[in-house]
């Protein structure tokens, strides 16, 4: 078994006709790895994503999960990761990230404030408040293998991915179906599933296969429902770390440098007390998302 990729949050090993994911305690925001490890994080991500893979698999949605090896390691089916997609090929990971948004938050809100996205683009006739529920889900696609994720229109997404419009529509339908399941499941434990991202492969018959990980406090945004109903947003995901770096001014400095093509500032470590809070959050969110004890 040899390591073939060291990602922002997990290491990937080649083990014959399967891959092994080893989840680390690393944490990243804004495509920057923070020089602070978060206790419990790797275990939380592995156990939570394993829960969801089993959950959707039992409900007929194909995915690459095989087994959990231990609490921080899982085995999955292997799909090709080509440098460039050949038209009509199969058995490869689509080089895109698929994002579904059910509420106004995160980078969508940033784009609305900046004017690059208009309220009408997301079905609204007014400028929304942060946290406002969308009239229908917003489905977005970004690049996956560029240095920073870039929002794509459908034509460029199809060109990069080798998908047909019909296959794109099938992926969208599958992901929205998963999100409906997630909303119902986490709603039992007082959570709102605000948004999330997923990765997809094409199987032998070019059918969609859910891959990588999803539904964790890393990929998805969760809020406390009782607080939301009272008019407050309580972040129960990695978003609390993003908000911390926004509050320090780091986010603005980073994106200013990116917009100017300047060297990016190093991201500073998390303070010790903040790292402890984040660790506790990942442990708690495993229980809140899955309904299972740590």
From Swiss-Prot:
It is an enzyme of class 6 (ligase). The keyword Nucleotide-binding applies. The keyword Chaperone does not apply. This is Phosphoribosylaminoimidazole-succinocarboxamide synthase. The lineage of its organism: Archaea, Methanobacteriati, Thermoplasmatota, Thermoplasmata, Thermoplasmatales. It comes from the Archaea. CDD domains: SAICAR_synt_Sc. PANTHER family: PHOSPHORIBOSYLAMINOIMIDAZOLE-SUCCINOCARBOXAMIDE SYNTHASE. Transmembrane segments: none annotated. Belongs to the SAICAR synthetase family. Signal peptide: none annotated. PROSITE patterns: SAICAR_SYNTHETASE_1 (PS01057). GO terms for cellular component: cytoplasm. InterPro entries: SAICAR_synt/ADE2_N, SAICAR_synth, SAICAR_synthetase_CS. Its EC number is 6.3.2.6. Pfam families: SAICAR_synt. Keywords: ATP-binding, Ligase, Nucleotide-binding, Purine biosynthesis.
């Amino acid at each position: 078994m040899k390591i073939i990729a060291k990602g922002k949050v997990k290491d990937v090993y080649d083990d014959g006709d399967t891959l092994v994911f080893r989840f680390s305690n690393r944490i990243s925001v804004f495509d920057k790895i923070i020089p602070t490890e978060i206790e419990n994080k790797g275990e939380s991500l592995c156990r939570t994503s394993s829960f969801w893979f089993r959950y959707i698999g039992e409900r007929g949605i194909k995915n690459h999960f095989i087994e959990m090896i231990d609490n921080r390691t899982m085995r999955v089916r292997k799909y090709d990761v080509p440098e460039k997609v050949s038209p009509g090929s199969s058995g490869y990971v689509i080089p895109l990230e698929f994002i579904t948004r059910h509420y106004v938050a995160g980078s969508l809100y940033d784009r609305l404030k900046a004017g690059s996205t208009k309220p009408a683009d997301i079905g609204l006739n007014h400028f929304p408040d942060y946290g406002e529920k969308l009239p229908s889900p917003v489905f977005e696609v970004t690049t996956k293998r560029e240095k920073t994720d870039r929002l794509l229109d459908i034509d460029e997404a199809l060109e990069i991915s080798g998908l047909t419009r019909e296959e794109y529509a099938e992926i969208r339908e599958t992901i929205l179906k998963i999100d409906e399941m997630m909303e119902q499941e986490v709603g039992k434990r007082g959570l709102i599933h605000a948004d999330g991202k997923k990765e997809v492969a094409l199987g032998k018959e070019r059918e969609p296969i859910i891959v990588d990980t999803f539904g964790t406090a890393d990929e998805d945004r969760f809020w406390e429902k009782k607080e939301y109903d009272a008019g407050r947003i309580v972040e129960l995901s990695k978003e609390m770390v993003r908000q911390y770096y926004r509050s320090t001014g780091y986010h603005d400095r980073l994106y200013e440098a990116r917009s100017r093509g300047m060297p990016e500032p190093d991201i500073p470590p998390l303070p010790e007390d903040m790292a402890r809070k984040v660790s506790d959050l990942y442990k708690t969110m495993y229980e809140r998302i899955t309904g299972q004890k740590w």
